[in-house]
Amino acid sequence: MSELTELFRNAIDLNRYSNSVSLRLVRAWNDAVLDVVEQLQLLDALDQSAKATRLRSVLAQLKESLDTWAGSSTLAMQQELQGLAVLQGEFATRQLQRALPAGRADIVRTVEISPTLAQAIVTAEPTAAGVVNLSDSLVRMSTQPVTFQLTLGQQLTLPNGQTIKQAFSSMSERQVDIFSLTVRNGIIQGESIDAITRRVRGRLQRDQAGSIDSIIARGGQATAIPNNQIRAIVRTSVNQVASTSDQLIAVQNPELTKHYIYTATLDTKTSDICRALDGKMFRHQEGPVPPQHYQCRSRIRNVPRGLEKEFSEIRETYGEWLNDQDDDIKRDVLGPQRLQMWNGLVRKYGPTNAIRKFVAQDGSTLNLDQLKSRGYGSSSE
């Protein structure tokens, strides 16, 4: 399998991995909300004084539940991203090895993944003592073994500058305020408790089956928007780990790669900035890197020294390449049950847009163990 083929296969698989993590966090959030909604429905049987007292208790329960969710979700993200960083570090190493001319793969220096990496990604403050930018330590890192650890905490924040921990906490606090305002205003305006609960929960049921898209579609005011935000945070963080792994391998091997190509082929609703950057070549540490925005799926490709011209002349999109392959390769990349879906998208949209539509509609999931079985960990080779 070629270096470019592996890159896009990896991007599709990471999308499925982010679906898996998002679904777990979304279901936990929705369970917390539904617990409170069930308590809210009991207010109808109470008199006005008891109703006010009970409402305060219900809102306190929501705050406690969502604060607990934020804490447990932060820990879950630490565990998930730690494992993912190990896999992606190995994958980025193999990508550079396969792009080099024959006989040079063994000279690629690898990156050690620190056990404290995930804590840095999820909780590190940009101004925390001891946190150093990647660019600040470029010379040191070029001559010494790289440890992917707390020194990268500053770089691994979300596009708005927040850490994952901050994003989850602020989202929980905001939704408690919105829920409280919605319920209180509804009661003041004479709306029935039943109508209020339908508005905040939508048609969502406990243990709701289906993809994350279908769960969001069934949700109400207290779940649909937060569920979308959870998915955006997870997807952005997963892509950031992958992108940073690519960058670290380049920093550790400056004599092997001097440039990278920005690749935005899998961005379904490609932003103006990613569309403008797609296919452009930049020197390492001097150009833009993903994620440029929330839910960004763009990646970078490290270009081996001396092959800049050949890499810059590659114009075939991944959709075009994939459509020319036999069905076995298509099944390996897309999944054994999705070949018919792919063929239908190609007929309707053409191969380039078909791959983007496919990723957008693909609600399937992969956990870390399944990613390993797909060949990303060294232990699975």
Model-derived features: where do they sit?
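Acidic, glycine-rich two-metal-ion catalytic cores of nucleic acid-processing enzymes
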Residues: 214-313
